[in-house]
Amino acid sequence: MSKDMSYSGVMSRRNEIMKNAIGIDYTTFESGSLSFDYEKMMRETGYTLEEMQKIQYSTGVGRTPVLELRNITALARKYAAPGKGARIFIKDEAGNPSGSFKARRAANAVYHAKKLGYKGVIAATSGNYGAAVASQAAMAGLKCIIVQECYDSKGVGQPEIIEKARKCEALGAEVVQLSVGPELFYKFLSLLEETGYFNASLYTPFGIAGVETLGYELAVEFREAYGKDPDVVVCSNAGGGNLTGTARGLIKAGAQSEVVAASVNLQGLHMASDTQFNKKSFTTSHTGFGMPFATWPDRSDVPRSAARPLRYMDRYVTVNQGEVFYITETLASLEGLEKGPAGNTALAAAFSLAQEMDKDQIIVVQETEYTGAGKHIQPQLAFARDNGIDIKFGNPKEEVAGINIILPENPGMIKAVDHEMNKLRKSLIKNALANYPDAKLDDSDIDFLVKETKSDTEFVKATIKEIKG
């Protein structure tokens, strides 16, 4: 009897498909009414930090250089109060084989897939992770399929995503490109079931644990070179894996650094809207992913996401598109480094945050990514203009996503905007209760929500009372 391949038929088998494609039975981690044992799940990787480093180093991943941005630091100090202006550094993750930190996630996932005997790997991703999986699969001799949400209903593709497809194909992957909408997950599940390949998801314990090496390296490198841990580490934030993994690595190294999430402000644009899909100039590290995934991580392609950023986030800031474009050009013209938009989102935030800090403090942008073709400033701005976006110089705080892109008239106008952390924490608790409406909360559930929100019992109980009225 043939399987029901209708949308509802495939979706009804999603848990079975996922279990077969990852080799993890997520039900074993469930504990209370809505809680699960996160640390037990993370231990499911079966690899120690040292083993993960060995896996990554064997394929040329990791041990990327830390670079001090002396000229950008000097520029930030021109706009800072006397005695202010922290030293700004970047960890140049563009030096990984596929051109981004996501090689760390992919190295672990692909290694594990081969160890378990899978013949290939599949990932649903707009690009950088796809390139990383394709690169690692090529090294491991595994087949690779990347599923992308690329086009609107008119067949117009976002240049950054098209560029990433080019890179994936160049590295030997088969790329399945889809229009915006619910068919992405359906097609992804169908391919997993049809091929029997490993789900190299961004959100498995294998992938997130792979980023722990980045945070650990940061702490070790700064102690060796500067005799101290970074005071602040800024992470570009979308699905939360970058921040989660980096923070966990810092913790394993015993570092006390403040961890800041940074996203591009795309407020007002709906990520699943066909008409708004090409109104944005950033396909990752933006609030359209960052906010929803921070306040409810379990919305991904696995039953329980290993990326849980609110557990580790001390601060969440946003910057506008024009500010990131400006800092991207600044990095190239002042430091001789041409990098892509994701890491430069965090750099725009760091440029602003450094001005609040003392001169002897250190702020680090923990990733860079490669640039070129559709990822570059020029094609992105040209594409925006073709889609009716007004591009001008002015006050970036007047920028409205989907309407205009405002490049700052001077660097001093780059200002990161803080988001109220307690508001995010309350949103997560509200989403947890909404997703588990029949939950009879016990102490384990309360403790879980305390950890999920990096808060305390009093805050969680008060929020639940407020929500339930």
UniProtKB/Swiss-Prot annotation:
It is an enzyme of class 2 (transferase). The modification N6-(pyridoxal phosphate)lysine is found at K102. InterPro entries: AKP_thiolase_beta (IPR053471), Cys_Synth/Cystath_Beta-Synth (IPR050214), TrpB-like_PALP (IPR001926), TrpB-like_PALP_sf (IPR036052). Its cofactor is pyridoxal 5'-phosphate. One of its GO terms (molecular function) is transferase activity. NCBIfam families: ornith_OrtB. Belongs to the threonine synthase family. This is 2-amino-4-ketopentanoate thiolase beta subunit.
